[in-house]
Amino acid sequence: MYNVTYHQNSKAMATSDSIVDDRKQLHVATFPWLAFGHILPFLQLSKLIAEKGHKVSFLSTTRNIQRLSSHISPLINVVQLTLPRVQELPEDAEATTDVHPEDIQYLKKAVDGLQPEVTRFLEQHSPDWIIYDFTHYWLPSIAASLGISRAYFCVITPWTIAYLAPSSDAMINDSDGRTTVEDLTTPPKWFPFPTKVCWRKHDLARMEPYEAPGISDGYRMGMVFKGSDCLLFKCYHEFGTQWLPLLETLHQVPVVPVGLLPPEIPGDEKDETWVSIKKWLDGKQKGSVVYVALGSEALVSQTEVVELALGLELSGLPFVWAYRKPKGPAKSDSVELPDGFVERTRDRGLVWTSWAPQLRILSHESVCGFLTHCGSGSIVEGLMFGHPLIMLPIFCDQPLNARLLEDKQVGIEIPRNEEDGCLTKESVARSLRSVVVENEGEIYKANARALSKIYNDTKVEKEYVSQFVDYLEKNARAVAIDHES
């Protein structure tokens, strides 16, 4: 049974952007997939809607709500859901960070078990809108039967979604016409413009550990697309000029950009972790340090970790490596840094083995570049601070992001062997120095700085949010419904 924790109060409502007199207050429910790369943008979007004076109910599971306590705005109503027990999941596993990628299929199975609880919430509270994620394939039809307007908030980049399939039916039936490796490693025929956005052969090989039996991600996403009144993207028109109209054409549904939702730098300067890292960074020359982070969930092999480490050593550059011991391709794999690496690079390298405050690190004046896996959130955070990117994509959307960003000349992708994806220390070192040290890196630095100005334009961001909320107000349930009637 769900447990609604009300943080909202009349005083808080009065301090938010007041609703124009002739508009009704909406009730918007939001329900993300159980991955923090999804949960945090959903929570941020929820806060922005609430700040416009609307009631927002944020749905997630009990343990995740507890983890989010410092992020939750008092304007938001929190709805705690009890995740059904699935035998194959570890005890208390309620997010993708809690499980090996092989077991994410069971987390999706558990989320599917939330259907009765979420349905009861919708029946009893009758929100005007429900904003959901790609996994919740069963939710659009339930919401439609209750007269609730439906939006899919996609935290994946629009070019990735456009690449995956030409229509929701193609997603559902796994029938986009691509049957060969060559088909999948060239831009699809439904792209009406030239682009480098496509997978390579070694990208396809890396997908295998993520494939699982049961309801496919394609089916889930296709059903979500098919049942939605609109699609929401964490994007600017300026960065998705071609892609957003293409998605509208492919899926025949309105596509609404909500802005980039850039995160805020935490205000606690006395955080012990940050104090230690800052002290190290303060001792380095301005614009000299490369920040390295590959996310907390990607599968990275022992060979890749060794070559990346030796490449950092070979480059001669100062670095901070947020090294949360990666998960190997199999559960039994043990991934370790090469012997002696930490000691040999101690004078110019900091290997941080627990959680690292990424935004704070990227904001420090000594940082000059970002070696990243190209997750969509990390891209925004790196470019917010004008850092050129050294890109080492791992799987799924990350290679597609890297191809587009390399084409826009905000960084370069570290070369791999085209057949097997093998990485070498020489390619790592050469890529780092090309972006950070050599003259050829000046174009990447200049373009990253230019994007930083766009990403930090608060006026533009506020306009996107206002237009998005205005869309919700004008299109709720197709006709205005007074909550008091």
Curated annotation (Swiss-Prot):
Main EC class the enzyme belongs to: transferase
Domain of life: Eukaryota
Keywords, in A-Z order: Glycosyltransferase, Transferase
Its EC number(s): 2.4.1.-
Residues that hold UDP-alpha-D-glucose according to the record: 296, 355-356, 373-381, 395-398
One Pfam family in the UniProt entry: UDPGT
One GO MF term attached to the UniProt entry: UDP-glucosyltransferase activity
PROSITE patterns xrefs: UDPGT
PANTHER family from the UniProt entry: GLYCOSYLTRANSFERASE, UDP-GLYCOSYLTRANSFERASE 91B1
Family statement drawn from the similarity comment of this UniProt entry: Belongs to the UDP-glycosyltransferase family.
Biological role stated in the UniProt entry: May glycosylate diterpenes or flavonols in leaves.
Designated name of the protein: UDP-glycosyltransferase 91D1
Originating organism: Stevia rebaudiana
